[in-house]
């Protein structure tokens, strides 16, 4: 198991990791406000706050994460909230291998892609594209340019040029927002034609 995966699993075993606020992302609330519910896939769902939020608003929500501790916490969070959401143990870069079946109307990745090594990023993008319905929204957020320490802990960043080149065959960039010094968020839309 890679060092970054060991560190993430250890963080969940020690309690709630610093990055887990337990609250849905405000941008997610804005993205789905006034929109008819559909199917949503949370890639790298962690403890499930976003999937639980979506399920509570009528969405059929599925979360996938490689950390068993995170999946267990997500299932508990859904049960405590009285909502039905599916949480699957698996690799976010290959959701179909974990039994996750699309198509989905909304995909989320809040803090997962920036930890995926370059060698697995093409597989991740292809997996996300394969799970997305034509016209689906994909909210991708994470660290744009990680400081040295974060790189040592497995953060690789999400640069605008990379998003255009890797995601471009499948998704259009509808919006990009820089948040603070290191964070970036992209609103991508799946092309109408199924590419790849």
Give each language-model segment a name.
Residues 1-43, 47-102, 116-131, 136-196:
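Class I (Rossmann-like) S-adenosyl-L-methionine-dependent methyltransferase catalytic domain
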Residues 108:
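A conserved beta-strand element that flanks and buttresses the S-adenosyl-L-methionine
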Residues 111-115:
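Short catalytic micro-motifs in class I SAM-dependent methyltransferases
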């Amino acid at each position: 198991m890679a060092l970054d995966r060991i560190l993430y699993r250890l963080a969940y075993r020690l309690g709630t990791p610093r990055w887990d606020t337990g609250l849905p992302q405000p941008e997610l609330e804005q993205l789905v406000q006034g929109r008819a519910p559909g199917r949503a896939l949370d890639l790298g769902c962690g403890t499930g706050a976003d999937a639980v939020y979506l399920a509570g608003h009528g969405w059929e929500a599925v979360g996938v994460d490689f950390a068993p501790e995170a999946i267990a916490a997500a299932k508990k969070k859904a049960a405590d909230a009285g909502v039905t959401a599916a949480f699957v143990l698996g690799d976010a870069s290959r959701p179909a291998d974990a039994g996750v079946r699309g198509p989905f109307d909304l995909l989320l990745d809040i803090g997962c892609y920036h930890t995926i090594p370059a060698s697995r990023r093409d597989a991740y993008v292809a997996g996300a594209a394969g799970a997305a319905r034509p016209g689906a929204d994909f909210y991708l957020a994470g660290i744009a340019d990680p400081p040295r320490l974060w790189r040592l802990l497995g953060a690789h960043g999400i640069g605008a040029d990379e998003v255009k080149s890797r995601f471009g065959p499948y998704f259009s960039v509808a919006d990009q927002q820089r948040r603070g010094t290191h964070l970036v968020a992209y609103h991508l839309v799946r092309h109408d034609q199924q590419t790849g």
